[in-house]
Amino acid sequence: MAGKFHILLLNGPNLNMLGTREPDIYGSLTLDDIVSKLSEEAHQSGVKFSHLQSNAEFELINRIHSAQGNTDFILINPAAFTHTSVALRDALLTVKIPFIEIHLSNVHAREPFRHHSYLSDLAVGVICGLGVDGYSFALQAAVNRLSKFN
């Protein structure tokens, strides 16, 4: 589908295990369920939507680099890379594409090492602790922001 805007969703390590990985924290929906729902919401909003999940940091970085010039907004759940990846931070700084950081769980109510993010201060916004709804809220915010400023 050709849309007015292109929004890219990136999901980091272990999110491919949603539905079976700690469902009391992350819920019972699979990543495919979440991406299908978000894809439909994007279609209804008239935007082009693409997605990549990877457990490999370099694949996420390469996808961020290839987004330059053809992507208007990034939604990213960096998962564990949130707390460790200066490289993801640098990639996002390099391409200068606005992004929203998403977390299913409230990272601030979890272990202390999860409280720090290398991305949050660069993000347009951060959504955490709202489960799967956080993805929909992020998509809606991105569409609203793109419509307002373009």
Curated annotation (Swiss-Prot):
Catalysed reaction equations from the record: 3-dehydroquinate = 3-dehydroshikimate + H2O
Tagged with keyword Lyase: yes
Short name of any one Pfam family annotated for the protein: DHquinase_II
Residue intervals passing through the bilayer: none
Superkingdom of the organism of origin: Bacteria
Pathway: Metabolic intermediate biosynthesis; chorismate biosynthesis; chorismate from D-erythrose 4-phosphate and phosphoenolpyruvate: step 3/7
Keyword Amino-acid biosynthesis: yes
Gene3D superfamilies tied to this protein: Dehydroquinase, class II
PANTHER family found in the cross-reference section: CATABOLIC 3-DEHYDROQUINASE
Protein name according to UniProt: 3-dehydroquinate dehydratase
Primary gene name: aroQ
